Amino acid sequence: MALLTRIRGPRDLDRLTPAQLAELAEEIRAFLVEEVSKTGGHLGPNLGVVELTLAMHRVFDSPRDRILFDTGHQSYVHKLLTGRQDFSRLKMKGGLSGYPSRAESEHDVIENSHASTVLGYADGLAKANKIQGHKDRPVVAVIGDGALTGGMAWEALNNIADSQDLPIVIVVNDNERSYSPTIGGLANHLATLRTTQGYERFLSWGKDALQRTPVVGQAMFDTLHGAKKGLKDFIAPQGMFEDLGLKYLGPIDGHDLQALESAFTKARNFGGPVIVHCITEKGRGYHAAENNDEDRFHAVGVIHPDTGLPVKTSGKDWTSVFGEEMVALGRERRDLVAITAAMLHPVGLAPFAKAYPERIFDVGIAEQHAAVCAAGLATNGLHPVVAVYATFLNRAFDQVLMDVALHKLGVTFVLDRAGVTGTDGASHNGMWDMSILQVVPGLRLAAPRDAEQVRLQLREAVEVADAPTVVRYSKGNVGPAVPAVGTVGGMDVLRRPEADSADEAADVLIVSIGAMAPTCLEAAELLAQQGISSTVVDPRWVKPVDAALPGLAAQHRLVVTVEDNGRAGGVGSAIAQALRDADVDVPLRDFGIPQEFLDHASRGEILDEIGLTAPAIAKKIEALVSTRSFARS
């Protein structure tokens, strides 16, 4: 790593020879494999953008020239070149974020890791530069890995194309999974011509001259313009961009430093919005990634660097339980279809796709469309299951509300990675869904506590034909089964009060939501050791509030809700409202995630920090019960 350790900032790259740059690229790849294999992270995308990132930082002057990464998971090389080479605690508490982070460096402009947003940022930044008199400062937006399938990206492109004087360089990182590259001498030649200002001036003059020519001028211009457009669309994929009025350069070999620097220099000097289309290879230089047909090691856990195999085999996770049950349901119900938003493998739908390829729809990074497409499928008598990460459902809220719920359609939304997910940081914690979905009329929301409940509640959800249903579960391994000892209404009783308190009101009713069940049971045991009796129930379906819950609450001195969701507007708030509506005057305390953007750390570390552990919950309950307001009479 002789060269890499000498790089403290982007300008250190200027002194390197072409041979040294090639050597540095290999050092960076070796570093990424060695370090990310120890911590886990987005390995494949970063191996594919080494030369691209080197070229950008040699041509553009960051942070004066803003360099933005859509989604941000391909920013590891950018971090290395901007003074951040300690990857020993990548994505861990106190270590580097797995995404750009403004707290880490002035070179990081944005840190939202939801896809398809970067072009909107670029549009706004460039317009601000113009207003502030900084028109000479280009904004560079790197977008790829399917993010151009998102509608937001095209909304931004439409606006960027309307501002021809904004120096925006849009780098399309095409890793051969979103586009079919067209590479050839003629295409490269035309692309070079189209990004020179002289060519633009010539085109403008020719257009005006032809259109001023009497009788035949306009017809000749239309003919020539049509021929140019037809030839352009035939030989290269720039047509879809140039039809918007955006200039296009490419395709460029994304691993040829000289070609990349030449293209970026032309784009920088053009003075208006330019598309630079770069063909890259995801996982480049690492045999295990290159031979992985599934996703080229898009994201990995801790692996053996030599083989790419996991260091340890994990147990069954929530996602695979869902995937298995979907396959079983598919055998039983021919009307069952599935939708994913570019996350076929991560959300567990790959087995369903293999078994029933005609009943799976991958709509790209387009959660809004996924919801409306599901509405259309349901309208025609099918039952769609839309599987997304919980944090990404935020993007489709209007469609859930107005296109599914308003029409009383039987659509099931399955929310993976619900609650605190940890190492991917603030944008990936699924802590908003149970709050925003509380306001949707008719929607029913399930929070399974274990694998058995995932299977049961998924089956219950797809039986509902006249309203949207939601099933949400956590990330990672699913724990042991948590058996019920009884039922009250539609709720499972997980623990009853001790025998010596059977003839009087128990102290505490603990309402456990989803994966918090083991924590709540442990807290109840700690309370029992202090002489505080408790009942623990799992509502299973947390929206609407079970009709039996107010009556059960009335038999206790204190009600406590514990949820892996933001406290504001969550299940605790809904239960409090239900108690008020039923005139049940029992104090309620809700435990949940504070309404904050939580830094990256492990799930356990975050739960400990915010007080969602059994000892912390028990201690707070003990303090509440010991006050005069809750003392035994």
Swiss-Prot record:
Q: Which residues form a coiled coil?
A: none
Q: What is its EC number?
A: 2.2.1.7
- Pfam families attached to this UniProt entry: DXP_synthase_N (PF13292), Transket_pyr (PF02779), Transketolase_C (PF02780)
Tell me the residue numbers annotated for binding Mg(2+).
145, 175
Reaction(s) this enzyme catalyzes, per UniProt = D-glyceraldehyde 3-phosphate + pyruvate + H(+) = 1-deoxy-D-xylulose 5-phosphate + CO2
Asked whether the UniProt record includes Metal-binding among its keywords, one would answer: yes
Q: Which SUPFAM superfamilies is this protein grouped with?
A: Thiamin diphosphate-binding fold (THDP-binding), TK C-terminal domain-like
- CC annotations in GO: cytosol
Chain positions recorded as thiamine diphosphate binding sites = 73, 113-115, 146-147, 175, 286, 367
| Keyword annotations | Isoprene biosynthesis, Magnesium, Metal-binding, Thiamine biosynthesis, Thiamine pyrophosphate, Transferase
SMART domains in the record: Transket_pyr (SM00861)
Q: Which GO terms describe its biological process?
A: 1-deoxy-D-xylulose 5-phosphate biosynthetic process; isopentenyl diphosphate biosynthetic process, methylerythritol 4-phosphate pathway; terpenoid biosynthetic process; thiamine biosynthetic process
Cofactor binding note of this UniProt entry: Binds 1 Mg(2+) ion per subunit.
Which NCBIfam families does the UniProt entry name for this protein?
dxs, PRK05444.2-2
Q: Self-association or partners: how does it assemble?
A: Homodimer.
Q: Check the record and name the PANTHER family matching this protein.
A: 1-D-DEOXYXYLULOSE 5-PHOSPHATE SYNTHASE-RELATED, 1-DEOXY-D-XYLULOSE-5-PHOSPHATE SYNTHASE, CHLOROPLASTIC
Q: What does this protein do?
A: Catalyzes the acyloin condensation reaction between C atoms 2 and 3 of pyruvate and glyceraldehyde 3-phosphate to yield 1-deoxy-D-xylulose-5-phosphate (DXP).
What HAMAP family would the database entry show? Answer: DXP_synth
| Annotated family | Belongs to the transketolase family. DXPS subfamily.
- What this protein is called in its record is 1-deoxy-D-xylulose-5-phosphate synthase 2
* Organism in which the protein naturally occurs: Kitasatospora griseola (Streptomyces griseolosporeus)
Chain's gene name: dxs2
